[in-house]
From Swiss-Prot:
Pfam family, one: RuBisCO_large_N
Modified sites of kind N6-carboxylysine: K192
Subunit structure: Heterohexadecamer of 8 large chains and 8 small chains; disulfide-linked. The disulfide link is formed within the large subunit homodimers.
Record-listed E.C. numbers: 4.1.1.39
Site, as annotated: Transition state stabilizer: K325
Record keyword Transmembrane helix present: no
Top-tier EC class: lyase
Protein name, entry field: Ribulose bisphosphate carboxylase large chain
The reaction(s) this protein catalyses: 2 (2R)-3-phosphoglycerate + 2 H(+) = D-ribulose 1,5-bisphosphate + CO2 + H2O; D-ribulose 1,5-bisphosphate + O2 = 2-phosphoglycolate + (2R)-3-phosphoglycerate + 2 H(+)
Length: 455
C-alpha cells in the first residue's frame, strides 16, 4: 500500500523491547514510574522512552525518513518496587547519537525535558543514569580534582575545614572580610560566601572580593598555611559571572564558587573551563536542589544531579551531612559521595546505585558536608566522609561564645584529634566523645565549644 499507516498507536509496540541488549555506548536511565490507574506499566515505561527520544503522540510521515531502530530510546526492563503498589522501576536505554557531546544541558533536555508532565503518568522520578565511557570522554569534568587541589593547597591526610560566613546578608564588605580573617587565622582552610551572596546593595561584589582577598593574605602570612575563600561568582548573566571570575584570578585567590542549579549547567560548564584554564578551584553549591530531589516519587534523585555536576565541572559540591540539620540517609549519601570521588563505582542497589559507573579517569569532586554540624559531630564526620572531603561549620564556628577565631581553633583541634586517633587505630564510632573530651583538656577553645553544643 502507498503511504504510511496514520493514527495513534500504543507506545509499547515500538518502544518496549524487553529482549533488547543494551550497548556499551548507550546512556541508561532508571525511572521510578507511577502510572495513572488503568495504564499498564509497559505502556508507561515505553511512553517515557518514546517522549524522551524519537516519539511523538501520533505516527508521522517523516518517521519514514529516518531509522527509528537506530535512534529510538528503548524501555528494556521493568520491575515493581517492593513495598509500593503501582510503582515500577523502568529502565530505558538511549542511543548515544541522540545527545550533543559535552553538553549536560542537552542531556537533561532530552532525558527529563518533556516527559515529567505526561498524562499517562501520575508521577515520575529519575533515580540514576549510567553515562557511557564514550560520552564521559566528551566532558572536561572538574577543573582540577581532588589530587591537584591537595597539591595546590599543600594539605594532605585529613579532611579540609570550611565555614560559611553568617549573617549571610547585611554585613558590609569590610566587616565581612574581618569575619573571614578571624576564621582563617584560627585554623580553618576555607571560608565561604553564602549561596545568595552575589552583589547586593549592602555589599557589591568587587568590594567583597577585595576585602576577602586582603583577609586571606593576612591570615596566610600569620599561619604559614594556604587559605581560601569561596568567592561566589554567580551572576545574572554568563558574561558578568566570567567577569567576576577574572577579577578573582587577578587578585590571585585560589578558589571561586558557583550555584550550579540556579546558575544553570551551560553557565557552570563555561565557568569550569575558565577555572581550569586559569588555575582557579571551583566550589559548587547546590541551591534549589531540593525543589527537584526532595519528593520520593517525582523529580530527580540528587545522585543524578551530582553525576551531572562531575561532568559539567566542579571541585567541591555540597552533599548533605548524614548527621546535621538537613536530611540524608547514610547509605544513600555515601553512595553518591563515592560517585563523586571514585573512578569506578559498582552497581549496588542498597546504596541507591542502579548502574555500574566508570568515570574513565575524570577527576573526582570533594563532597562538602555542611548544615547544622558542630565539634561533637567531628568523629562521625571524619569516619563517614574520610580524608577526601570538606567539613563546613557555619554556626559551628561563628556561634562559639568567644568569637570566630576561637570557634575556628575549636574545630581545627577537634579535627586533628580525630584524625590522629583514627591513625592510631582507635574506633571513632564508639570512642568519639571520649576523643573530643580528651582533646578539650588541652584546648580551652574546644572545651567552651563542647559546653555550648553538648547534646
Amino acid at each position: 500500500s502507498v503511504g504510511f499507516k496514520a493514527g495513534v498507536k500504543d507506545y509499547k509496540l515500538t518502544y518496549y523491547t524487553p529482549d533488547n541488549q543494551t550497548k556499551d555506548t548507550d546512556i541508561l536511565a532508571a525511572f521510578r514510574v507511577t502510572p495513572q490507574p488503568g495504564v499498564p506499566p509497559e505502556e508507561a515505561g515505553a511512553a517515557v522512552a518514546a517522549e524522551s527520544s524519537t516519539g511523538t503522540w501520533t505516527t508521522v510521515w517523516t518517521d519514514g525518513l529516518t531509522s527509528l531502530d537506530r535512534y529510538k530510546g528503548r524501555c528494556y526492563h521493568i520491575e515493581p518496587v517492593a513495598g509500593e503498589e503501582n510503582q515500577f522501576i523502568a529502565y530505558v536505554a538511549y542511543p548515544l547519537d541522540l545527545f550533543e557531546e559535552g553538553s549536560v544541558t542537552n542531556m537533561f533536555t532530552s532525558i527529563v525535558g518533556n516527559v515529567f508532565g505526561f498524562k499517562a503518568l501520575r508521577a515520575l522520578r529519575l533515580e540514576d543514569l549510567r553515562i557511557p565511557n564514550a560520552y564521559v570522554k566528551t566532558f572536561q569534568g572538574p577543573p582540577h580534582g581532588i589530587q591537584v587541589e591537595r597539591d595546590k593547597l599543600n594539605k594532605y591526610g585529613r579532611p579540609l575545614l570550611g565555614c560559611t560566613i553568617k549573617p549571610k546578608l547585611g554585613l558590609s564588605a569590610k566587616n565581612y572580610g574581618r569575619a573571614v580573617y578571624e576564621c582563617l587565622r584560627g585554623g580553618l582552610d576555607f571560608t565561604k560566601d553564602d549561596e545568595n551572596v552575589n552583589s547586593q546593595p549592602f555589599m557589591r561584589w568587587r568590594d567583597r572580593f577585595l576585602f576577602c582577598a586582603e583577609a586571606l593574605y593576612k591570615a596566610q602570612a600569620e599561619t604559614g598555611e594556604i587559605k581560601g575563600h569561596y568567592l561566589n561568582a554567580t551572576a545574572g548573566t554568563c558574561e558578568e559571572m566570567i567577569k567576576r571570575a577574572v577579577f578573582a584570578r587577578e587578585l590571585g585567590v585560589p578558589i571561586v564558587m558557583h550555584d550550579y542549579i540556579t546558575g544553570g549547567f551551560t553557565a557552570n560548564t563555561s565557568l569550569a573551563h575558565y577555572c581550569r584554564d586559569n588555575g582557579l578551584l571551583l566550589h559548587i553549591h547546590r541551591a534549589m536542589h531540593a525543589v527537584i530531589d526532595r519528593q520520593k516519587n517525582h523529580g530527580m534523585h540528587f545522585r543524578v544531579l551530582a553525576k551531572a555536576l562531575r561532568l559539567s565541572g566542579g571541585d567541591h559540591i555540597h552533599s548533605g551531612t548524614v548527621v546535621g540539620k538537613l536530611e540524608g540517609e547514610r547509605e544513600i549519601t555515601l553512595g553518591f559521595v563515592d560517585l563523586l570521588r571514585d573512578d569506578f563505582v559498582e552497581k549496588d542497589r542498597s546504596r541507591g546505585i542502579y548502574f555500574t559507573q566508570d568515570w574513565v579517569s575524570l577527576p573526582g569532586v570533594l563532597p562538602v558536608a555542611s548544615g547544622g554540624i558542630h565539634v561533637w559531630h567531628m568523629p562521625a564526620l571524619t569516619e563517614i566522609f574520610g580524608d577526601d572531603s570538606v567539613l563546613q561549620f557555619g554556626g559551628g564556628t561563628l556561634g562559639h561564645p568567644w568569637g570566630n577565631a576561637p570557634g575556628a581553633v575549636a574545630n581545627r583541634v577537634a579535627l586533628e584529634a580525630c584524625v590522629q586517633a583514627r591513625n592510631e587505630g582507635r574506633d571513632l564510632a564508639s570512642e568519639g566523645n571520649q576523643i573530643i573530651r580528651e582533646a578539650s583538656k588541652w584546648s580551652p577553645e574546644l572545651a567552651a565549644a563542647c559546653e555550648v553544643w553538648k547534646e
